């Protein structure tokens, strides 16, 4: 199976997000890469579900709380930017202060 670099990136994000979901379900606090992957995957799936850019930007701040991530992680992530494919094309989503 041949995958484009973009498809490989999507699979890597999905895999990291899946690991983060499992760790979160066990009550573990997420580290920086797990936090970014989980939020990024949620944004990508939201676009697939038909949500708008504005909806995703708003929802992106409610995916994880400060109590679900390791100390210092919220301060490390001032924003997350993701290029997401919508039915009408690819758009850049920016979520400011994603972990509140």
Swiss-Prot record:
Its EC number is 3.5.1.5. Pathway: Nitrogen metabolism; urea degradation; CO(2) and NH(3) from urea (urease route): step 1/1. It is found in: Cytoplasm. It holds the Pfam family Urease_gamma. Signal peptide: none annotated. Keywords: Cytoplasm, Hydrolase. InterPro entries: Urease_gamma, Urease_gamma/gamma-beta_su, Urease_gamma_sf, Urease_subunit. GO terms for cellular component: cytoplasm. HAMAP family: Urease_gamma (MF_00739). Belongs to the urease gamma subunit family. NCBIfam families: PRK13241.1, urease_gam. This is Urease subunit gamma. It comes from Bordetella bronchiseptica (strain ATCC BAA-588 / NCTC 13252 / RB50). The lineage of its organism: Bacteria, Pseudomonadati, Pseudomonadota, Betaproteobacteria, Burkholderiales.
């Amino acid at each position: 199976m041949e995958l484009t670099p973009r498809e490989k990136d999507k699979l890597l994000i999905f895999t990291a997000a899946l690991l983060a979901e499992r760790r979160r379900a066990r009550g573990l606090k997420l580290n920086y890469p797990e936090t970014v992957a989980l939020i990024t995957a949620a944004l990508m799936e939201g676009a697939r579900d038909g949500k708008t850019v504005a909806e995703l930007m708003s929802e992106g701040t409610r995916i994880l709380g400060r109590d679900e991530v390791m100390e210092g992680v919220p301060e490390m992530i001032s924003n997350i930017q993701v290029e997401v494919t919508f039915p009408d094309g690819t758009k850049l989503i920016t979520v400011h202060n994603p972990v509140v």
